Amino acid sequence: MKIAVIEDEKPIREGLVHILNKISPEYQVVGSAENGAEGLILLEEEMPDLIMLDIQMPDMDGLQMLKEARARGI
């Protein structure tokens, strides 16, 4: 399962990636991003199966990112 982690707090983002990599060899963290704009690029490039997304982030929050992803057909 391809997983993208989108979280503005670096310790949380890195912790999630670390935990997911240890839980199961079937989990493949395909990338992480620190805001919604970077997250959109990650989604377009990697097309993950699961998105772990923070809702409150600076610049573009998680809800705005989801709306934009839907508008782009991602």
Question: What are these model-derived regions, one by one?
Answer:
Residues 55-57:
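Receiver (REC) domain active-site loop signature in two-component systems and cognate sites
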Residues 17, 32-50:
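Acidic, metal-coordinating helix/loop segments flanking the phosphotransfer/catalytic sites
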Residues 1-2:
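Non-catalytic signal-transmission and effector/linker regions of two-component phosphorelay proteins
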